[in-house]
Curated annotation (Swiss-Prot):
It comes from Taxus baccata. One of its GO terms (biological process) is polysaccharide catabolic process. This is Endochitinase 3. It is found in: Secreted, Cell wall. Disulfide bonds: none annotated.
Amino acid sequence: MYDESTGYSSALK
């Protein structure tokens, strides 16, 4: 899923 707050995919977290 894409994270609007960071501009990156939440899978990277």
